[in-house]
Amino acid sequence: MHPDKRNRYEKKIGIIRKIKKKHIFLALLAVIVLGGLAKAYSAWVGTTRIAFLNYQAIALGQISHANDNAMIKLSEITTDDFDHLDDYDMIIVNGMGLRIDENQRKQLEEASYKVPTLTHAATNPANNIVSVDNFDADYLMQYIENGGKKNYHSMLAYIRKFIDGKKFMAPEPERVNERPDYLLTHFDPKDEKGDELGFNSIREYNAFLAKNGLYKEGAPTIMLTGFMGAAPDMEKAFEKKGFMVYRINKLQSFIAGHHADSIQANAVVNMAHGRLGDYFVEFMKQKNIPLFSPLNINRLTTEWESDKQGMNGGFMSQSIVTPEIDGAIRPYVVFGQRINKEGLQEVYGIPDRMESFVESVLGYVNLKNKKNSSKRIAIFYFKGPGQNALTASGMEVVPSLYNLLVRLKNEGYNVGKLPANPQELAKMIQAQGAVFGTYAEGAYTKFLQSGHPALVTAHQFAGWTQKALSKKMIKEMNQLYGSFPGKYMATDDGKLAVARLQFGNVVLLPQVMAGVGGDSFKIVHGTDQAPPYTYVASYLWARYGFSADALIHFGTHGSLEYTRESRWHSTATTGVTD
């Protein structure tokens, strides 16, 4: 190659190499700058991720409602998430009742070396894992212990600014707002998600009610206590129905200080499980008012609805059995959990069940104020098909039922013309209140002619089921038994016969078979099918057709508690009683 050409070629190559080096340098510089910016963003601007372990949905829901910072992300974690603890900027642990094994405890301890961790209320000293300094721990603990929207809001701001060290959208947290120990509380009508308003006297509370249009002279009044439900949801439901609600924060002080004597309470509703105590039982005896115990399923509503068991033994005992020692009634699911916009579980009042519960309480209150002569009572008794007798362990059912009717008459109830004796009542039950097997066509024909059954039309049944049953249950009945009225207890003109004996304002009804088939024992003790039309119709006729004020199951247990999805807490799903 000619020397001049070689020189020009080498010069060109040198220029290219310089350009490449410059590009490489600029690229490296860009990487360094971008890396620095990313690091700076992560350190000063990025999202603060806070994990909560072993937190109750009620508390976590309150913390979630307090978070208005888009740069703070809250997450609920379980032991299944322990492999990803390093993904968070702060871990807060509720140590009360925390159950972790040695390996899980080691994982949490190791994570605390990298991630600031605070455990509070640890019942096991080994679980008291804290890696923030004493000053920060003390400040955060004060926010947690005092609770409320303001304190939780400040706690989250404190974590972002001082624990996570962020500069962007990191406001100065407010000082701890010490929570006063109020006697009564009420949600703020102007800010329902905010902190509850507190009152230390009936006079203060009544003034608040009057100012907000909630004081109603002569209205039914309830005392609402306990902390396992969404209190504002229940308060609003009762107030919408015309009740005056006294939300009691310190029940024992409220009673011992005779504040309760200043109001004419018609009922007490306790949202907590377990016992209230002997002092409260004495109070209830003096006032002669009922105690209601709405249930919180403490899990997602969707999970509960698909679970045939519904509640396990221990939780059922605390929520249903133990409150009954105090005389609690109506253990009915009102509260469940749902996923909120932050992806966290929160407690809420299930709307249709809340409405049903409030209606039931109102029914009890109205019943007490109603004259005995006007009260309407439906009494369901259990007997086998055909000539089988009414049964109950250790009880002569028909004589006992007759004695009840006589007692009702003596108490001023309208029972019309009663039979002369228990034997006559037994004959009437066999003729008018029998339970028929699907095989007893001849006896059923005779019953239609002389048994004086109530007849339910397709239009009535459709209206009643839409009020009382879930769409799922209606669909299952239609699929299993065809179009109304089906084949069992049906008339030729498309009506459904309901066996009953009516004595004035008291009606006796047999609890008909809860399924179809020849094995009556199995049907009584639980089938995995929707109950037939006639089973549902007898209860809905008592409720809507007869307009019963009260319903009594008389004698041995029947099949209601074994019908599909009715384990104590699901009767509204089954829809056959109220």
What does each model-found stretch correspond to?
Residues 2-578:
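An N-terminal assembly and electron-transfer interface module characteristic of large anaerobic redox
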